[in-house]
Regions:
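RNA-binding accessory domains that recognize and position tRNA/RNA substrates
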Residues: 1-147
Length: 148
C-alpha cells in the first residue's frame, strides 16, 4: 500500500476526523498510486494518521479509516453499511411501514466519503462520487444486496 506524507502541521484537521486530505497538504508520496487505490496517510513525522482512497484533484484522499489495522475489504463494507442501516432503523427511517424510501448512506456523514446509497423499496441505487468508490462499487454492492 502506498504512503502519503503530509506537510508539517497539515494533520490537524485529520486529528479532528476531517474526511478529506487536500492536495496542497501533501508533501510527497512513496511511489505513484493509481486513482482509487487505498493509501495510508502519515504525518511529517512519519506517524500513521488515516487511510483512504487516493484521487488526482484538489481532494487528494477521501478518508475511510483512522485505524491502521482496519483492512478495506468486504468485511469493512459490510460493517460500515450495517452501521448506517442500524442508525436509520433506530430512528424509524428504515423498516418503516409508511415509508420504504430513504438514503442509506450520506457520504461523509456516514464516514464513507464519495458514496451515496438510496433505498427505494427493495432497490438500492448507488452513486460513486470518487474514483475509489467507483472501483469498489461491486464489493459495496455485494455487501448491500443481502439486505435489500
Amino acid at each position: 500500500m502506498y504512503k502519503v506524507y503530509l506537510k508539517s502541521g497539515k494533520e490537524e484537521s485529520l486529528k479532528r476526523f476531517h474526511p478529506w486530505v487536500f492536495s496542497g497538504a501533501i508533501a510527497h508520496f512513496d511511489g505513484e498510486p493509481e486513482e482509487g487505490e487505498v493509501v495510508e496517510i502519515y504525518t511529517s513525522k512519519k506517524e500513521f494518521i488515516a487511510k483512504g482512497h487516493f484521487q488526482i484533484g484538489s481532494i487528494a484522499v477521501r478518508v475511510l479509516s483512522f485505524h491502521q489495522d482496519e483492512a478495506i475489504d468486504s468485511d469493512f463494507w459490510k460493517r460500515k453499511l450495517s452501521i448506517a442501516y442500524e442508525m436509520r432503523r433506530s430512528i424509524g427511517i428504515a423498516e418503516n411501514p409508511t415509508n420504504n424510501t430513504y438514503r442509506l448512506v450520506h457520504g461523509e456523514g456516514d464516514n464513507l466519503p464519495g458514496l451515496i446509497i438510496d433505498i427505494y423499496a427493495r432497490t438500492a441505487v448507488m452513486q460513486a462520487h470518487s474514483a475509489g468508490m467507483h472501483l469498489d462499487r461491486m464489493e459495496i454492492t455485494r455487501s448491500e444486496e443481502r439486505r435489500v
